[in-house]
Curated annotation (Swiss-Prot):
This is Arginine N-succinyltransferase. Its EC number is 2.3.1.109. It comes from the Bacteria. It catalyses: succinyl-CoA + L-arginine = N(2)-succinyl-L-arginine + CoA + H(+). The keyword Repressor does not apply. Succinyl-CoA binds at residue 125. Belongs to the arginine N-succinyltransferase family. Catalyzes the transfer of succinyl-CoA to arginine to produce N(2)-succinylarginine. The gene is astA. It comes from Escherichia coli O17:K52:H18 (strain UMN026 / ExPEC). One of its GO terms (biological process) is arginine catabolic process to glutamate. It holds the Pfam family AstA.
Amino acid sequence: MMVIRPVERSDVSALMQLASKTGGGLTSLPANEATLSARIERAIKTWQGELPKSEQGYVFVLEDSETGTVAGICAIEVAVGLNDPWYNYRVGTLVHASKELNVYNALPTLFLSNDHTGSSELCTLFLDPEWRKEGNGYLLSKSRFMFMAAFRDKFNDKVVAEMRGVIDEHGYSPFWQSLGKRFFSMDFSRADFLCGTGQKAFIAELMPKHPIYTHFLSQEAQDVIGQVHPQTAPARAVLEKEGFRYRNYIDIFDGGPTLECDIDRVRAIRKSRLVEVAEGQPAQGDFPACLVANENYHHFRVVLVRTDPATERLILTAAQLDALKCHAGDRVRLVRLCAEEKTA
């Protein structure tokens, strides 16, 4: 059975294996053991209540409960940009016009922005390619909404998610090549690694401070503004079905879109509800896949089950109860996947 649980110190080698499969561009999952160990420690200290809000971040893994295999990772940053500035480009417009010459030009322009400072962030979503089946991607991505719904007071009113931009298999980013490299004088992979390992001072030091007309970029770079890496397209679709939207903010490195949503408008958060759980044999029928989560902050668990999403009393097997760290009579959080999201 596939289960979402909080990360543990012993997961570092599994996270290293996942990091080696990302293909680059996933800044928050670098193949660097010291960085990943520090990330795990920060998550553990967050759960233990030892960090200020500006440093808090939760990390979860997707585990096969039978074999112990870690198949994926996802995370939530509680409030971005309160320690180090959190940069985006806002894609806006500058108008240059002359009535005398009968000239009017509305020019797409990139403005350096810290507009998302303080927002909660969905990040570090990666599922091992071998496990991209049977609804695992939905479970991994949406489990975070179950945690946010259960512990709403831990998070801020706006949630953002940076989507990986267009990068080829050799680490070539058209957006970086045309813009970032001119200011940072390094390859995309180097900048990506520095950022992923926490060495972010260079961003503030070297970032272009003035608006940039996109027409000055290569056509290839212009074409990828706000576009996602092909492997990231499913993750974008999942978030958009939950209510997230692209509001013209992009990543400063690869030009990928930043999606955002008010936390209380996220579908899975808004529609999830608490039901009593009982042990038994679940009813047979053509039921939709539903996320089921416990309400245990320190031992949080989420699984995917097929059941009636309108039920008031959820029947689970002993194995499912064990996976959820629940007992008969406990209350669990339940929400169905979107109707079009198939798990088989």
